[in-house]
């Protein structure tokens, strides 16, 4: 989910 890559969005 988005939560799994939430910090990769930075």
From Swiss-Prot:
Expression tissues: Found in axons of the male accessory glands, the salivary glands, the heart, and the oviduct.
Superkingdom classification of source: Eukaryota
Main subcellular location of this protein, as a coarse class: secreted
GO BP terms, alphabetized: neuropeptide signaling pathway
Location of Phenylalanine amide modifications: 10
Name of this chain's protein: SchistoFLRFamide
Keyword annotations: Amidation, Neuropeptide, Secreted
Cellular location(s): Secreted
GO CC annotations, alphabetized: extracellular region
Keyword Glycoprotein tagged: no
Keyword field contains Secreted: yes
Source organism of this protein record: Locusta migratoria (Migratory locust)
Family membership noted in the UniProt record: Belongs to the FARP (FMRFamide related peptide) family.
Reported function: Muscle inhibiting agent. Involved in the neural control of the visceral muscles of the heart, accessory glands and oviduct. May be involved in the regulation of saliva secretion.
């Amino acid at each position: 989910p988005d939560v799994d890559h939430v910090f990769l969005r930075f």
